Amino acid sequence: MKKLYIKTFGCQMNEYDSGKMADLLHADEGMVMTDRPEDADVVLLNTCSIREKAEDKVFSDLGRLRELKKTKPNLLIGVGGCVASQEGQQIVSHAPYVDVVFGPQTLHRLSDLIAKRRETGLFQVDISFPEIEKFDHLPASRQTRGSAYVSIMEGCSKYCSYCVVPYTRGEEVSRSFDDVLTEVAGLASKGVKEIVLLGQNVNAYLGKMGDRQEIADFALLIEYIVEIPGVERIRFTTSHPKEFTQRLIDVYTKVPKLVSHLHLPVQHGSDAMLSAMKRGYTALEFKSIIRKMRAVRPDLTLSSDFIVGFPGETEADFEKLLKMVEELNFDNSFCFIFSPRPGTPAANLHDDTPYEVKLKRLQTLLALVESQANQISQKMLGNIERVLIEGLAKDGINLQGRAENNRVIHFTAPAQNIENLIGQMVDIRITEVLNYTLRGKLVEAYVH
């Protein structure tokens, strides 16, 4: 039986795509996954180009795979994702031992590309943008319990000045309303309890409803999904403040299964920086969204993405960012120093801020966010949290799962119950706060 190894870089969209690659090659060629590239017949790197560091890791991994291919000449190496979309033929020029290069929108052609490589002996490159065709050619997910990603749209039409996504994944295109509901219903019928809706700007969703001329927005989609039997929890990522409508806020008042955790990237707290980034909203408008959300969900936890050291960022700009973070009380968030990406407008902006200053600002921001996150964790001590069990923790002994606020929680369960608990919702009493996780005890009477 042929074995497949996939290494995934970057966002949840890439994780979803990697799962689809595995499903596709299992359906077409009977391939099974391995966690060791040395044992694989096919190795795929699903890449991310959002920051230079992630891109560098890909080429570092390719260097190691070159050595592996010397010992396994029949090993097939494929590069997919956003670096593949951005670099295309250059990947093969840089690493001629790569066999297949494919973009996010052509992963459904992966089996054909592999077959052509084997038949012709020629490397294959397909980084075209056939809109959302791939969803018509991918097999159903094999996920049977727990949580599952469902991609509802692809691409981005916002063109923020620093971001490569519109160039690597194309413009925004939504899947049809009926297709999304069919996929969700199929997953729920197999035992999946939590649905995570995915898109680069997921709340910009506008899906065609059957043969009608009507279009469903994101709020309506959620209202329909919650009615599907078996769906117990709904999340979504990543949303954009510009598309965070009052209709979507109103859904939070009607759909308790929509979690009280929101990841909403703000990027900065200074209007000057937000304008330079071409984000399309002001700091005040972002704050207004959060205040409205907390009015309908007082227990809402908020995480975000932040960029420091953007070209032109002054100390006053940075202080405005810190003030916003203090005011809105963010949970665990992603904080980065600006990474200029080739082909984006921001890459050409004059940047005279020393790296040491940027690094100090990053450390200051991280300390503030981590302090706020720790306070949120401390407030959970003694609480009983509804937790969806994902599987064994890294120690191989404890189980781990996620609470509604996306916190990872570890707990011990009797050995004979472990397999039965995976994929289930259970109630856990929080007993200890660690650096990045919580520990708790299973409340025996409350297994759902």
Swiss-Prot record:
Keyword Ubl conjugation in annotation: no
Superkingdom field: Bacteria
Paired cysteines (S-S): none
Residue ranges annotated for the MTTase N-terminal domain, each copy included: 2-119
Free-text comment on the cofactor: Binds 2 [4Fe-4S] clusters. One cluster is coordinated with 3 cysteines and an exchangeable S-adenosyl-L-methionine.
Cofactor: [4Fe-4S] cluster
Record EC number: 2.8.4.3
Residue span(s) of domain TRAM: 378-444
Entry keyword Nuclease: no
Catalytic activities: N(6)-dimethylallyladenosine(37) in tRNA + (sulfur carrier)-SH + AH2 + 2 S-adenosyl-L-methionine = 2-methylsulfanyl-N(6)-dimethylallyladenosine(37) in tRNA + (sulfur carrier)-H + 5'-deoxyadenosine + L-methionine + A + S-adenosyl-L-homocysteine + 2 H(+)
GO molecular-function term, one example from the UniProt record: 4 iron, 4 sulfur cluster binding
Gene Ontology annotations for the cellular component aspect, listed alphabetically: cytosol
Positions contributing to [4Fe-4S] cluster 1 binding: 11, 48, 82
Enzyme class: transferase
Signal peptide extent: none
Oligomeric and partner information: Monomer.
Task of the protein: Catalyzes the methylthiolation of N6-(dimethylallyl)adenosine (i(6)A), leading to the formation of 2-methylthio-N6-(dimethylallyl)adenosine (ms(2)i(6)A) at position 37 in tRNAs that read codons beginning with uridine.
Protein name per UniProt: tRNA-2-methylthio-N(6)-dimethylallyladenosine synthase
Record organism: Polynucleobacter necessarius subsp. necessarius (strain STIR1)
Lineage, broadest ranks: Bacteria, Pseudomonadati, Pseudomonadota, Betaproteobacteria, Burkholderiales
